[in-house]
Amino acid sequence: MRKILAFFFLVGFAVGAFGQEHKVNWMTVEEAVAAQKKEPRKIIMDMYTNWCGPCKMLDKYTFQNEDVASYINENFYAVKFNAEGDSSVAFKGQTFTNPNFDPARVRSRNSQHQLASYFGVHAYPTVLFLDENANLLTPVKGFYKPKQLEIFLKVFATNDYKTVTTKEQWVDYQKNFRSEFN
C-alpha cells in the first residue's frame, strides 16, 4: 500500500512539475519604477490590447516559455500594460489615463491610453525596453517566438546595445548571436 501511495505521489509531482506554466513576474509601471530605485534593472513592457490575436500568442507561446520567463525574471522588471485600458498611471511626474475609454468596448478596439501614445506605440503587440532610469531604449513591434525575442532580451540585459550603434553592427551582432533558448 505504501508503495502504491508513493508511486501516485511521484506521478502527481512529476505531472505537476512538467505541466506547470512558467510565469513572468508581471508588475505595474509604478511598481517597476519603484523597484528600479531599490535595485536598478531595465524594464521590459508588454504593450497589448484585449482584441489583439498576436498579443495573445506572444503571451501564450513566448512569455510562458521557461527560458524566456526565467531570463526576464532574472534580468528585468516586467510590466504588462493594456494599451487601451482604463488605468491611471503615474510615470515621470505625469499622470496618464485613457479619457476616451468606453467600457462597452472593453473586448474590442477602444481608445488608446495616453501612456501608449507617450511611448509612440501604434501597433500591437509592442515590447518596450526601458533603461534603469525608465527611459525608452527601443520598441520591438510584433509577435516573436522565444528564440526570436532572445536576441533583444540579451542585447539589452548585457548592455551590448551600447556598442551596437549602427545598422551594420546590428547585422553582424545577429550573425554572430547563438541562441540558447528552447
Where on the chain are the PLM-derived regions?
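Structural micro-motif
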Residues: K42, T97-R105, H113-L128
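A short beta-strand-turn-helix
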Residues: V24-K42, I72
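Short active-site neighborhood of thiol/selenol oxidoreductases, capturing the structured segment around
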Residues: E39-K56, A78
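Thiol-based oxidoreductase modules, predominantly thioredoxin-like and allied folds used
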Residues: K23-W26, N65-R107
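Loop/turn elements at helix/coil->beta-strand transitions in domains of secreted/extracellular proteins
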Residues: E39-I43, E74-Y77, Y124, E132-N133
